[in-house]
A protein has these predicted regions:
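N-terminal amphipathic alpha-helix/helix-capping segment at the start of soluble metabolic enzymes
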Residues: 1-9, 13, 49-50
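Hydrophobic faces of well-ordered beta-strands that scaffold small-molecule active sites
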Residues: 4-10, 27-29, 56-60, 92-94, ...
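Catalytic cores of alpha/beta
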Residues: 11-21, 68-83, 127-142, 166-171, ...
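Active-site-adjacent beta->alpha loops and helix N-cap segments on the catalytic face
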Residues: 14, 33-57, 71-75, 96-116, ...
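Glycine-enriched alpha-helix->loop->beta-strand junction motifs that scaffold or abut catalytic
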Residues: 21-27, 52-55, 88-91, 114-118, ...
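Glycine-rich phosphate-binding active-site loops on the catalytic face of alpha/beta enzymes
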Residues: 26-38, 83-101, 144-157, 194-217, ...
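Glycine-rich nucleotide/cofactor/substrate-binding loop typically near the N-terminus or early
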Residues: 60-69
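C-terminal alpha-helical cap/extension of soluble enzyme domains
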Residues: 170-243
């Protein structure tokens, strides 16, 4: 089997560079990890594109919460896709549902069309759909190159059987990329069990603040943050290469 592709979800430019150093094949850049991810700033995308030597995909998501978007949010996402094209990104990561949990094909077709020559990944809005096999056919019809999914479960490990069924259903018409809860201990088993040849992980670690001064009155405002760990990325890569 061909070498399995490792995509790292990176919540900052620093995380993206760490992922590259660790051996990632591709970056998904986003902001607001704690809220499931939103579109990163123009500056973050621009600097990431300048610094990275590997493919850069950008999450297009106007806000946290559900995946049912209003016209204003759609306008914002279309503008963000235009910026990604302007900055030379390799792909965008999109997704939208209607109120009944079906793929919002009208909006998604606009997003895919706006992406033009860029590759398109349908994100984990897919896992929130009411009928995953039906949703997969809709995503394929949109012309997306891949779908990121945990098989509708809390983790790709828990959804491995569904992922395997989706891979079989796809019949090479689209790449089913496994993601959610993957680490160096389970990624090889998930890859082997599902047949997924693209895998998505965050490889995140806590970054402690270097501040010596801290105001204890600011309850809930932690000075620490989360970054991608290059060592964990390397461990993920090694685990996949050992299959």
């Amino acid at each position: 089997m061909a070498r399995r592709l490792l995509e790292i979800a990176s919540n900052s430019v620093a995380s993206a560079l760490a992922a590259q150093a660790g051996g990632a094949d591709r970056i998904e850049l986003f902001d607001n990890l704690a809220e499931g991810g939103t579109t990163p700033s123009y500056g973050s995308i621009a600097v990431a594109r300048e610094r990275l030597r590997i493919p850069l995909f950008v999450l297009i998501r106007a806000r946290p919460g559900d995946f049912h978007y209003e016209a204003l949010e759609a306008e914002i996402m279309l503008r963000d896709i235009a910026h990604c094209r302007q900055l030379g990104c390799d792909g965008v990561v999109i997704g939208a549902l209607d109120a009944d949990g079906n793929v919002d094909t009208a909006l998604c077709q606009r997003l895919v069309s706006a992406a033009g020559p860029l590759q398109v990944t349908f994100h984990r809005a897919f896992d929130a759909a009411r009928d995953l096999p039906a949703a997969l056919e809709q995503v394929i019809a949109l012309g997306c190159q891949r779908v990121l999914t945990s098989g509708g479960k809390a983790s790709a490990e828990a959804g491995a059987d569904t992922l395997a069924a989706l891979v079989a259903q796809s019949n090479a018409r689209i790449s089913v990329m496994a993601g959610a809860g993957l680490n160096a201990r389970n990624i090889a088993a998930v890859a082997a069990r599902t047949g997924c040849v693209e895998l998505h992980a965050s490889a995140k670690a806590a970054q402690c603040s270097a501040m010596r001064h801290h105001n204890p009155a600011l309850v809930g405002l932690s000075p620490d943050w989360t970054v991608t760990d290059a060592g964990e990325v390397a461990a993920l890569r090694a685990a996949l290469d050992a299959i």
